[in-house]
Design a protein with these regions (language model features):
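Short catalytic micro-motifs in class I SAM-dependent methyltransferases
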Residues: 114-118
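A short glycine-rich, Lys/Arg-flanked "PGG" loop and its adjoining helix->strand segment in the class I
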Residues: 127-139
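C-terminal alpha-helical "lid/dimerization" subdomain adjacent to the S-adenosyl-L-methionine
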Residues: 146-202, 210-211
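Class I SAM-dependent methyltransferase SAM/SAH-binding core
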Residues: 58-99
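Conserved class I S-adenosyl-L-methionine
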Residues: 1-46, 48-57
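A conserved beta-strand element that flanks and buttresses the S-adenosyl-L-methionine
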Residues: 111
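Core SAM-dependent methyltransferase catalytic element
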Residues: 203-225
Length: 225
């Protein structure tokens, strides 16, 4: 079941969420998301599009979409604590992205920025999310995914994050290392399955853009009918 985030009581923050909140400021993350969405083509989408962001967290991706001029925006995330951080106009739901609270073919675009790698059971959960996305998207809709990928850059970053002196020197690096520690099982399970993940995405969506750089997988596509 899903419910509007503002109806959910505050919950005690967990260690992963605490690290996420100190990894970068709200403004830093909004600027990052705005630049990323523009770079991946979202700046060219019609502004009246119905756009939903899955795993939207504290809603900075929703703020980025609003800055780009989108007016019909919704978000879904499992964490009421993170959603309580959002102060924008988009309607946000506490809900499971494997079972979306939307009718068939009602969305023009769906965005995931760093949420798929949190899924506990791969590939089953990933296929459930992809099937739900294909269900709620209109035939000419789009998906946009940005997820961690084990490029040489990310391997090097993992190595640096293992050194306590460097973590003490950089709050951002320490926050990243803490997030990895608290999601290690799902994170490493995701990174260990690159071919399987990419093939599953291409089975559900026809790629218009796909790239692997700076520790990220960037995918933009349309649903296969």
């Amino acid at each position: 079941m899903s419910e509007p985030a503002h109806d959910v009581a505050e919950q005690q923050i967990d260690p992963w969420e605490a690290a996420y909140l100190r990894f970068e400021t709200q403004e830093e993350e909004i600027r990052k998301f705005t630049d990323r969405l523009r770079r991946l083509g979202a700046g060219e989408w019609p502004r009246e599009s119905n756009v939903v962001e899955l795993f939207c967290g504290r809603g900075n991706g929703l703020h980025a979409l609003a800055r780009l001029g989108f007016r019909n925006i919704e978000g879904v995330d499992l964490s009421p604590r993170l959603l309580a951080e959002f102060s924008g106009e988009a309607l946000c739901y506490v809900g499971d992205c494997r079972e979306l609270p939307f009718a068939d073919q009602t969305k023009d675009a769906a965005i995931v920025q760093g949420g798929l790698h949190h899924l506990p059971v791969l590939p089953d959960d990933l296929e459930r999310v992809f099937a739900e996305l294909r269900r709620v998207l209109r035939p000419q809709g789009r998906v946009l995914f940005v997820e961690p990928w084990l490029t040489p850059f990310l391997r090097a970053l993992h190595g640096v994050a293992q050194h306590p002196p460097l973590r003490r020197w950089s709050m951002k690096l320490d926050a990243l290392a803490t997030m990895i520690e608290h999601e290690r099982q799902t994170y490493e399970n995701w990174l260990d399955r690159p071919q399987e993940i990419a093939q599953l995405a291409r089975r559900y969506f026809r790629a218009e853009h796909e790239s692997f750089a700076w520790g990220k997988w960037n995918f933009v596509g349309r649903p296969r009918l």
